Amino acid sequence: MNIHNEIAADPQTALDHFEKLLSLETDCWDVHAALASGAPGFVLLDVRSPQAFEGGHVPGSLHLPHGRINERNLAAYRPDTLFVVYCSGPHCNGADRAAARLARLGRKVKKMIGGAEGWKVEGFALEKGAEVPRDSVASVSGLVSPIQGHP
């Protein structure tokens, strides 16, 4: 069987599928444009290990490994805050794990497809180094405060 012989989805099924994907995912270009606007309306979370974050992360992202996503670490954020999560790239399921945890906690979430690798492939620079101290972290959305209990 090849693509010409396979039955394609009807247009409504395709529309439903792709609209659902767009409600769950965003891409590096959209995140970059939103961050550049100065008022993205979301909190960008790098959910990788501390070493990966220090090695290079999306500017403006906060570090919260997917295993540390819990109500206590989200308590400072308004319930309607949108979180955009990313991990290393398509070979990593950390963003999926983070998104599932956030959704389980009743939080709005999207995954940035491509992750840190996709960010680089699109030609955007990663920032190196450890996260800035908690008391100087500026909210990327202007609506939230730093993660409580986060080193």
Language-model regions: role of each:
Residues 66, 115, 132:
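Residue-level "edge-of-site" marker
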Residues 62, 80, 126-130:
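Short, hinge-like loop/turn segments at secondary-structure boundaries
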Residues 38-44, 59-60, 82, 108:
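Short active-site oxyanion
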Residues 58-67:
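A contiguous binding-surface segment within folded domains or other stable secondary-structure elements
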